[in-house]
């Protein structure tokens, strides 16, 4: 007898409940501990612009195509510099072990577009805030930068920024992280200061929304034969479960599909550039526009629709056999947007 294949559904229970994401800005729940030898941000945020295809030289020694030119699909991310408007110190709460904010410092001068999402004080007392940092730095376990995107520098014609919290890591010393955070106050950070071409990153974004869908599209359930014994329907399950319990979550049911936050691990950075004009098609990216500043090319696909915010971070689960750390050699890049 052959192998018995029983696959009544194709949906994972690990992503329940399948409901709409609470916010279109991704919420990162896990940040890795990396040793970079110097303090740095552990993540970056960019906007999805579209896709191109590139001809690159295969640099994995174990590949049969090693040293030859291969075609790779790449996702283009519009990556304007992030503005650092503050930082926070966290400690561990002794009662439950959760992180708790103990000090916060804001930059003395903030741009006008921050007022679109924050109510700013008339005058920020930085000296008073820094005294609190000095008081609690001995019990601090985490330092996180408060960053704002700059969509007015992107191609989407948007003015209201998104606010995120990105940890500062790379070194174990909290004092070094605090000094680095103070040096960044009121300044901008470009993608080249966070990532390098050739390395792996995790991409986190909210997927495309599909609305309310049936079990065929949502779970890939087999369509029933169209004959008289299936008169109650064809694009449905044979049964929705027993009378009791009344609802079984393992049973495929129609409902919301898409607009879920998802994480894809270990995507390779093909290239990081400063001039978006060199990769933008003549007519611009479809449904996006023109990239004017820094950009990031990611090998493969990235979750989400165009214009959606994508958060990149250092890999939380790096593979045992990582690709070469050197920048891939891009021979040719298409000029037609997908």
Curated annotation (Swiss-Prot):
GO terms for biological process: translation. It comes from the Archaea. Residues 230-253 are annotated as: Disordered. Keywords: Ribonucleoprotein, Ribosomal protein, RNA-binding, rRNA-binding. Pfam families: Ribosomal_L3. GO terms for cellular component: cytosolic large ribosomal subunit. The keyword Transmembrane does not apply. The keyword Nucleotidyltransferase does not apply. InterPro entries: L3_arc_euk, Ribosomal_L3_dom_3_arc_sf, Ribosomal_uL3, Ribosomal_uL3_arc, Ribosomal_uL3_CS, Transl_B-barrel_sf. One of its GO terms (molecular function) is structural constituent of ribosome. NCBIfam families: L3_arch (TIGR03626), PRK04231.1 (NF003261). One of the primary rRNA binding proteins, it binds directly near the 3'-end of the 23S rRNA, where it nucleates assembly of the 50S subunit. Part of the 50S ribosomal subunit. Forms a cluster with proteins L14 and L24e. Belongs to the universal ribosomal protein uL3 family. This is Large ribosomal subunit protein uL3. It comes from Pyrobaculum neutrophilum (strain DSM 2338 / JCM 9278 / NBRC 100436 / V24Sta) (Thermoproteus neutrophilus).
